[in-house]
């Protein structure tokens, strides 16, 4: 995507990090939203190896990045760098979004509420059984949400036994 508006020193920067993150649709989605809303902002994807996570998080503050989303494999490990963790993220054991407030790192998890809200919008039936493909961080959040909604049954299908 070409950023049609000139990027300046005042442009707000948001990003997603993961290993890999370059495949993420987040930049396309966010940049389209920024354009539609007339925001002076840009959203980028950065591949960040696990051993570079701490530097990436602290770099967020150093470079004035306004918000950061996280994908695999960083959602659990990043928690130790947070000054405050939202109760839901703490219960799920995973953070997928970071913002800085008053110089402090705040970690959130939007996987569970976003997924459950989407299911409810499409007529979620708690009397039905659900199949969840995958057992990573996002899947854990979705399983948590489905369990709290009282679904009849939940089947988790994964390629490996490690999760």
How does the language model describe each region?
Residues 18, 107-109, 119, 123-151, ...:
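Glycine-rich adenosine-cofactor-binding loop
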Residues 2-122:
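Phosphate/diphosphate ligand-binding glycine-rich loop within oxidoreductases
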Residues 163:
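Conserved short alpha-helix immediately C-terminal to the canonical SAM/SAH-binding motif I
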Residues 48, 159-160:
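Short beta->alpha hinge that forms the Motif I/post-I loop of the SAM-binding pocket
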């Amino acid at each position: 995507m070409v950023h049609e508006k000139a990027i300046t020193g005042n442009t707000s920067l948001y990003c997603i990090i993961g290993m890999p993150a370059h495949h993420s649709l987040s930049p396309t989605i966010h940049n389209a939203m920024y354009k539609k809303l007339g925001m002076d902002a840009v959203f980028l994807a950065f591949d960040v190896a696990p051993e570079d996570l701490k530097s990436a998080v602290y770099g967020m503050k150093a470079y004035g990045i306004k918000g950061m989303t996280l994908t695999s494999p960083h959602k659990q490990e990043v928690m130790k760098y947070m000054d405050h963790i939202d109760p839901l993220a703490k219960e799920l054991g995973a953070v997928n979004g970071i913002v800085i407030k008053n110089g402090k790192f705040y970690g959130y998890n939007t996987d569970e509420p976003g997924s459950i809200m989407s299911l409810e919008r499409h007529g979620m039936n708690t009397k039905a059984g659900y199949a969840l493909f995958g057992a990573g961080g996002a899947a854990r959040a979705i399983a948590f949400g489905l369990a709290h909604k009282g679904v009849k049954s939940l089947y988790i299908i994964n390629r490996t036994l490690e999760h």
